[in-house]
Every structure is written in structure tokens, then in C-alpha cells.
């Protein structure tokens, strides 16, 4: 199934630096929708609220966690589609994102607060179309913050992957129920 850009669901993930959580969420959602044959129905991106990592590639542990865990989450064919993960370049969230995306998912309360501050001063807030919420509101068992694994070890990245994957499976169920 193919959708023109007008009918695509446009999803943006936002964390602090755009090298760990939001990048991981972008990768996971791309994998899930590719595996279901609906990648063309989505426009998926990620950004950070800070400027710390603009232009940087994903944290190597993000890439490693996705490579280790995606195989059990998506089809082998879809996994081949993601050899370009390290080509991602971090970018900063901008006020234009409010009018470009249908869904803007913050990884935690701090990210959500920063997004709302940008919205308050946005020159595009009158054209604001996005639903803004924490991705963790889609968690199966309880609403969570997707914790930043940056200062942790691989186990923290794998926990992050599991939370992101769980939330996105539930988000897709909601999207499918609306169609």
C-alpha cells in the first residue's frame, strides 16, 4: 500500500540529544511499519530538544541495541532495510515541526516540557496540527517515561528498546483501530 505524503501519518520522536531514545524510536517504528508493508503510509523522523549533538551519528549503543533486538521484533527482510541506521544525523527540534507532524512524542516529562515551551513561543502555533504527548503513555502496563540510557550500560539501552518497542506496538494498534 502506498500513500501520498498528504495522507501519510507523520510521526516525530523527541528526546534530549537525538542520539539515543528518539533515534531508537524512529528506527523501531520504521521497522514495525516496514515489516507490516505500510512504510509508505508513514513519514517518521526524530529530533532533540538540545543542540548538544546536532550532526552526530547515533550513540553506538543505540545501534548495537537495535541490531540485537530488532531481529525478534520485525521480519528478516525488514531487518535488512536498516543497515543505514548509522547514517542518521541528529537534528534539533524546531517550531516548524508543529505544523509538519501529526504526532510528536516526547520520551519523558522534561522533553515534553521543552516541547511545550517551544510551542508557547512558536511562530507556527496557529498552524499547529500535532498531537503532543509522551510516548510512554502507550506502555502496556503503565504510563512511563522512556528513561535516557546515555549514562548507563548496554542493559539500559536494551531496557529502553523494550519500552520503546512495547509503546510503538500499542501506538500502531491504536492507529489501525482508527482506520
Swiss-Prot record:
Its main location: cytoplasm. The active site is at 15 (nucleophile), 21, 148 (proton donor). Keywords: Cytoplasm, Hydrolase, Protein phosphatase. One of its GO terms (molecular function) is protein tyrosine phosphatase activity. Pfam families: LMWPc. One of its GO terms (cellular component) is cytoplasm. It comes from the Eukaryota. Its EC number is 3.1.3.48, 3.1.3.2. It is an enzyme of class 3 (hydrolase). The keyword Hydrolase applies. It catalyses: O-phospho-L-tyrosyl-[protein] + H2O = L-tyrosyl-[protein] + phosphate; a phosphate monoester + H2O = an alcohol + phosphate. Acts on tyrosine phosphorylated proteins, low-MW aryl phosphates and natural and synthetic acyl phosphates. This is Low molecular weight phosphotyrosine protein phosphatase. It comes from Dictyostelium discoideum (Social amoeba).
Amino acid at each position: 500500500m502506498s500513500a501520498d505524503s498528504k495522507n501519510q501519518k507523520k510521526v516525530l520522536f523527541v528526546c534530549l540529544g537525538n542520539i539515543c531514545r528518539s533515534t531508537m524510536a524512529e528506527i523501531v517504528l520504521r521497522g514495525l511499519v516496514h515489516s507490516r508493508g505500510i512504510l509508505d503510509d508513514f513519514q517518521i523522523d526524530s529530533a532533540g530538544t538540545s543542540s548538544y549533538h546536532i550532526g552526530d551519528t547515533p550513540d553506538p549503543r543505540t545501534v548495537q541495541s537495535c541490531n540485537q533486538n530488532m531481529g525478534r521484533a520485525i521480519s528478516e527482510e525488514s531487518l535488512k532495510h536498516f543497515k543505514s541506521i548509522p547514517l542518521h544525523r541528529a537534528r534539533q527540534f524546531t517550531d516548524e515541526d508543529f505544523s509538519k507532524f501529526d504526532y510528536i512524542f516526547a520520551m519523558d516529562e522534561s522533553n515534553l516540557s521543552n516541547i511545550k515551551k517551544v510551542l508557547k513561543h512558536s511562530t507556527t502555533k496557529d498552524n499547529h496540527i500535532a498531537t503532543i504527548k509522551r510516548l510512554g503513555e502507550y506502555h502496556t502496563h503503565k504510563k512511563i517515561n522512556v528513561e535516557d540510557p546515555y549514562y548507563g550500560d548496554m542493559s539500559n539501552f536494551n531496557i529502553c528498546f523494550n519500552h520503546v518497542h512495547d509503546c510503538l506496538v500499542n501506538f500502531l494498534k491504536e492507529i489501525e483501530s482508527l482506520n
